[in-house]
Curated annotation (Swiss-Prot):
Belongs to the ArgJ family. The gene is argJ1. This is Arginine biosynthesis bifunctional protein ArgJ 1. One of its GO terms (biological process) is ornithine biosynthetic process. CDD domains: OAT. SUPFAM superfamilies: DmpA/ArgJ-like.
């Protein structure tokens, strides 16, 4: 169940000493070929980390032989030296693997504004390269964790081919993408343009529909590598469906491990005039701190849902809005509906349905509650 499950993928992780916990903090995922096609999606934040800028350049060639990922330092807002360090990282991996640095993607996660400990990182690349294995995906997934409490992996099989993936992310989770690093692999034989469309389509309806705290990272990276080792050549829709399943699995694991969360909130907006309206309403509900506090207190406060909807530009009439919480329509036609005491909120997952009664479009956004643990964790996060 890891990123190295597809044929032609190897991986590994090691400890290089940038985490006070002493946990693994450097990961390597390698596409052994015969094909090395790749595509990716990056943060929409205008302040981009050095590894994002580097990897964007690498992907212009449509080929990636390996991805080096470090946790414990974002290498963001580090100026020319930060970019030089990323370049040196790619060069070291290229030398260890026998490839060109122009085919080595780099991803980083951790504290913004600090330089990476290159004296420890570069030897770590050599160590990770020496320990590469088709069974090394789990160790790679463990090595990219920051505030994550669990490592996150997923695999799905097609007809004679498969897709695997790993992800990290627990805080700064918001659309565009979400604060995350994701590496996806497949042994299907597909060209870069096909991979590019597939990964963008998958990200749009999975990672971009996760909104934990409304904060957008400088380092978000989703990479898709295709080895072609299975010889399988699926049609676009077949491949896209499997890829989407893997991304959805990983996205759900991200929200389930969000910092300090005690509730996972599934927000479904239905009967919207457009999909964009549905997404806007869902995101706005997801970011409403008063509602998130109410959910934490197991209070089915539908008024806060309507208040959030009212701040959007979506098409709707206030007197036609309906809201259900865990299946109980607590708001009907813009006013009180069924009794709030009918809503059972004891369980981890809370389902909110917002019916705009304005069209035929819908969208699902995943969020979580706001807790004292979240505040503590982020106030204690060292700067």
């Amino acid at each position: 169940m890891t990123v190295t499950a597809p044929k032609g993928s190897t991986g590994g992780g090691c400890r290089r000493g940038s985490k006070e916990s002493g946990q693994p903090d450097l990961a390597l995922v390698v596409n052994e070929g015969p094909r090395r096609a790749a595509a990716g999606v990056f943060t929409a934040n205008r302040v981009k980390a050095a590894p994002v800028l580097w990897s964007q350049q690498v992907l212009r060639g449509g080929e990636v032989s390996a991805v080096v990922l470090n946790s414990g330092g974002a290498n963001a807002c580090t100026g020319p030296k930060g970019f030089q360090d990323t370049h040196a990282t790619a060069e070291r991996a290229a030398a260890a693997l026998g490839h060109s640095a122009a085919e080595i993607a780099v991803a980083s996660t951790g504290l913004i504004g600090t330089y990476l400990p290159m004296d420890r990182l570069l030897p770590g690349i050599d160590k990770a390269a020496a320990e590469l294995s088709p069974h090394g995906g789990e160790r790679a997934a463990i090595a990219i964790r920051t505030t994550d409490t669990v490592h996150k992996t997923a695999v799905r099989a097609g007809e004679g081919w498969s897709v695997g993936g790993m992800a990290k992310g627990a805080g700064m989770l918001a659309p565009g993408l979400a604060t995350l690093l994701v590496v996806l692999t497949t042994d299907a034989d597909l060209a870069p343009p096909v991979l590019d469309k597939a990964v963008r389509d998958a990200v749009r309806t999975t990672f971009e529909r996760v909104d934990s705290d409304g904060c957008m990272s400088t380092n978000d990276t989703v990479l898709l590598l295709a080895s072609g080792a299975s010889g399988g050549d699926p049609g676009y829709e077949e491949f896209a469906d499997v890829l989407r399943e893997v991304c959805e699995d990983l996205a759900r694991k991200l929200i389930g491990d969000a910092e300090g969360a005690s509730k996972d909130i599934r927000i479904e907006v239905i009967h919207a005039a457009t999909e964009d309206d549905a997404v806007e309403v869902g995101r706005t509900i997801a970011r409403n701190n008063l509602l998130k506090c109410a959910i934490h207190g197991e209070d089915p406060n539908w008024g806060r849902v309507l208040s959030a909807i009212g701040t959007t530009k979506a098409v709707f009439e206030p007197e036609r809005l309906n809201v259900a919480i865990n299946g109980v329509w607590v708001c009907r036609e813009g006013s009180a509906g069924d009794g709030r005491d009918l809503v059972d909120m004891r369980f981890r997952e809370v389902r909110i349905t917002a019916d705009l009664d304005a069209g035929t479009h819908s969208a699902v956004i995943w969020a979580n509650d706001l807790t004292a643990e979240y505040v503590h964790e982020n106030s204690a996060y060292s700067s």
